[in-house]
Amino acid sequence: MNVLSCSINTLNGLYDLSGVEVGQHFYWKIGGFQVHGQVLITSWVVIAILLGSAALAVRNPQTIPTGGQNFFEYVLEFIRDVSKTQIGEEYGPWVPFIGTMFLFIFVSNWSGALLPWKIIQLPHGELAAPTNDINTTVALALLTSVAYFYAGLTKKGLSYFGKYIQPTPILLPINILEDFTKPLSLSFRLFGNILADELVVVVLVSLVPSVVPIPVMFLGLFTSGIQALIFATLAAAYIGESMEGHH
């Protein structure tokens, strides 16, 4: 009961935290909802980059791949390896989901360092990487949660919920709490790392605007790629865990 009360208090605290804003934001009204316009703009740019790259890669496929086709086939093989390692032999249907997560986060993270967002002026706020906004990372984490629940229910039916009393019913509250901590850890890890990286670069550029920030930017690109890989790997691991039923 204490664990349940703690979970409710944690959710209430997160709801209150969602009302806290850092800096200024450019809002749009869509269907009665207020959304962050700059996040939608940058997300659409990232999606356009991914769709455009995919269209170019499959425009004229060759039996012996060269150039861009070779690169994209390597990326696909890499995503397949990650999915197979974490999910197992039934990884096939989940490759598109894991690949979409990885590529969207990867390009979003890199866009914060490589695209000149600052030159686009908004009435309020400024453009930045989509993953620099907690709303984006929480949405990605919730999609992952829906995916592993769907995977478990599809594979096992209602018997999937038996995992909550394994290995002993005493662990029921902890096993339930785990389903809240997974999306929290995914979202805050990604958001915190990307936000910290962009803040460090901004501070260094303002202090020493010539040479010093360049190594930090390269380090940021490396860590951004690692964060995308970590997110995709954990998403695949959670899906595999729900299908196998072990911790």
From Swiss-Prot:
Major location (coarse):
plastid
Q: Which GO terms describe its molecular function?
A: proton-transporting ATP synthase activity, rotational mechanism
Q: Name one GO cellular component term.
A: proton-transporting ATP synthase complex
Domain of life of the source? Eukaryota
* The entry's keywords: ATP synthesis, CF(0), Chloroplast, Hydrogen ion transport, Ion transport, Membrane, Plastid, Thylakoid, Transmembrane, Transmembrane helix, Transport
Recorded topology in the membrane: Multi-pass membrane protein
Q: Which SUPFAM superfamilies match?
A: F1F0 ATP synthase subunit A (SSF81336)
Provide the transmembrane region boundaries. Answer: 38-58, 95-115, 134-154, 199-219, 220-240
Q: Where in the cell is it found?
A: Plastid, Chloroplast thylakoid membrane
Described by its record, this protein's role is as follows: Key component of the proton channel; it plays a direct role in the translocation of protons across the membrane.
How does the record describe its quaternary structure? Answer: F-type ATPases have 2 components, CF(1) - the catalytic core - and CF(0) - the membrane proton channel. CF(1) has five subunits: alpha(3), beta(3), gamma(1), delta(1), epsilon(1). CF(0) has four main subunits: a, b, b' and c.
Alphabetized HAMAP family for the sequence: ATP_synth_a_bact
Q: In which family does this protein belong, per the annotation?
A: Belongs to the ATPase A chain family.
Per its record, how is this protein called by name?
ATP synthase subunit a, chloroplastic
Provide the species name.
Helianthus annuus
Q: What is the lineage of its organism?
A: Eukaryota, Viridiplantae, Streptophyta, Embryophyta, Tracheophyta
